[in-house]
Amino acid sequence: MTLSSKSIRRGAVVGALVVGVGTSVAAAAPATTAALHCGIYWGSLPKTAKITETAPMMNVRAGQHACFDRMVVDVRAGGADGYFVHYVDTVRQEGSGFAVPLRGGARLQVTVVAPAYDNYRQTYRPANRSELVNVAGWQTFRQIAWAGSYEGQSTIGLGVRARLPFRVFVLQGPGAGSRFVIDVAHRW
């Protein structure tokens, strides 16, 4: 074997390695891209569930996650499962129809079939109707405000950064209660 054929063979091996590494990087790119978007496929159309049970709501809380912000409405024993959540131009108060001002580029009206009262006694009384949970500095949520409870349902205004994908589901427990969960993605 001559010096030039060794050089050619060495060049071919190095070239094959470079092509192989390039192929590995290209193959890994889609997985990385999918991970960046968190696999969210929820969409932004209205979400609804029919009522099969109802019980009074007890609390509203929220949390931040890597891919979304989450709001939870806690419901007392007996559980509840009916809801209607959708983007609106203006969130309206239950009963009066007055506008509920909200910060953010888009507004979600969250209506749960769970009154904030039981036998004429309040089961949920927010300390500050305009700020149910402090979400200052959060990635997606801008404001969570109380819009009232009337005729067996309660409405919450959720101000968000922009019209983003969201999902809604009901979890049973802890105990005999249930939780309405609203997740809004950080991005599309």
Describe each PLM feature range.
Residues M1-T32:
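Secretory targeting and sorting signals
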Residues L3, P30-W188:
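Short linear recognition/processing motifs and adjacent strand/loop elements at protein termini
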